[in-house]
From Swiss-Prot:
GO cellular component terms, semicolon-separated: cytoplasm
Coarse class of the protein's main subcellular location: cytoplasm
Protein name as catalogued: Ribosomal RNA large subunit methyltransferase G
Compartment(s) of residence: Cytoplasm
Protein function: Specifically methylates the guanine in position 1835 (m2G1835) of 23S rRNA.
Keywords: Cytoplasm, Methyltransferase, rRNA processing, S-adenosyl-L-methionine, Transferase
This protein's record includes keyword Coiled coil: no
Main enzyme class: transferase
Source organism of this protein record: Pseudomonas putida (strain GB-1)
Leader peptide range in chain numbering: none
Cross-referenced InterPro entries: DNA_methylase_N6_adenine_CS, rRNA_m2G-MeTrfase_RlmG, RsmC/RlmG, SAM-dependent_MTases_sf, Small_mtfrase_dom
GO molecular function: 23S rRNA (guanine(1835)-N(2))-methyltransferase activity; nucleic acid binding
Domain of life: Bacteria
Length: 374
């Protein structure tokens, strides 16, 4: 794979999760542009830099040991990528502190480097949180490939930080630089909430949660067909989002044990808050993780999953396929994976390669609900 070569370092970086013969690299021209811009400003070694939404550590690893760097974002996979790429390049895995998006930063920062996220609500929440964390003379520099840089990103920076200057394009990337100006302290519009009729739930959704304004149509199709009579089964909601699948299932299965897993810290935070609101102090596990990668083999009876079909701006079924493999490893013999998916994705044939029995539980014109038994 190509090396990331910048004025700061030459790095060998990998994506997370790792895939054999992965054609995609772990950095892009926007990373290079951000690092070149920062280097041109010649900050001293005491400069505190906050890096936001660094996909696999390209920015933070480049600056580690040279400036006072803190990394933050909503992706546990990005956090794993940062740790792996630090050690891969001769640094200790904890040499750059990481702050999950469900937590808050400490202190003031002189520079903030931002990779513009796919979800602008996350960017807005981060810009609002920056108020009170920017040192005098600080700059916020956001970077993205032009095809992934909406006009609204600059508007949000102008609204919450200060005047914005757009750079010239370079290798199809562009930077937006905001200089701190006096702005009224903003109140965050997040988390958002919506009401569900069946079951009757009020659901909290932090800024980066998928379909935070309302129930997605795949989950809506899945809910009436969740498994019943689970007894004391051990159940995982894999890619739990705001936790609605696990919560709806738990309401009908009072003796089952639940684990809610997502790679988004804000999703896990939302799921935990929603569980408490719906089920009080009933025990459950809430985990930000790389799916079921750390779960003991043959330790689950049921897995519920509405698999994602993209990682940031990359679309494909590689994450779903990986989740299916993880579910197979974690399930006991005779255990079952229940999923919902778009018809055109062909999940039935993919599951048949991993499980001894696959059946269609229900279908709509757009979705299928499948049960795969190990």
């Amino acid at each position: 794979m190509p090396l990331l070569t910048t004025p700061y370092a030459e790095l060998d970086l990998i994506r997370q999760p790792e895939q054999a013969n992965d054609p995609l690299q772990a950095f892009d021209a926007a990373d290079e542009y951000l690092l070149a811009q920062l280097h041109e400003q010649a900050p001293d070694a005491n400069c505190r830099v906050l890096v936001l939404n660094d996909s696999f550590g390209a920015l933070a690893v480049s600056l580690a040991g040279r400036l006072q760097v803190v990394s933050s974002g909503d992706s546990h996979l990005a956090h794993l990528g940062l740790e792996k790429n630090l050690t891969r390049n001769g640094l200790t895995f904890d040499s750059v502190p990481f702050v999950p998006a469900s937590e808050h930063w400490q202190g003031l920062f002189d520079r903030v480097l931002v990779r513009v996220p796919k979800t602008l609500a996350l960017l807005e929440e981060q810009l609002i949180r920056l108020q009170g964390h920017l040192a005098p003379g600080a700059q916020v520099i956001a970077g993205a490939m032009i095809k992934h840089l909406p006009r609204a990103a600059g508007d949000l920076m102008e609204k919450y930080i200060g005047p914005v200057q757009a750079s010239l394009a370079q290798k199809k990337a562009r930077l937006l630089t905001a200089t701190v100006a006096e702005r009224p302290l903003a109140r965050s519009p997040y988390p958002s909430r919506y009401h569900l009729d069946a079951p009757a739930l009020e659901l909290v959704n932090h800024a980066n949660v998928f379909c935070r304004e309302g129930l997605d149509i795949g989950t809506r199709a899945f809910l009436p067909h969740l498994p019943r009579d689970l007894g004391n089964a051990r159940v995982a909601d894999l890619g739990c989002g705001n936790g609605v699948l696990a919560i709806a299932s738990a309401l009908g299965n009072p003796d089952a044990e639940y684990t809610l897993v997502d790679e988004s810290y804000m999703a896990v935070q939302s799921a935990q808050e929603n569980w408490r609101a719906a089920l009080g102090e009933r025990a459950a596990n809430f985990v930000a993780a790389d799916g079921l990668a750390g779960v003991e083999k043959q330790s689950l009876d049921v897995v519920l999953c509405n698999p994602p079909f993209h990682q940031q701006q990359v679309v494909g079924d590689f994450l779903a396929w990986r989740m299916f493999q993880q579910a197979r490893e974690a399930l006991v013999v005779g255990g079952a994976l229940y999923i919902v998916g778009n018809r055109h994705l062909g999940y039935h044939s993919k599951l048949a390669r991993l499980f001894r029995g696959v059946e269609q539980v229900a279908a709509t014109p757009k979705f299928v609900i499948l049960k795969a038994r190990k």
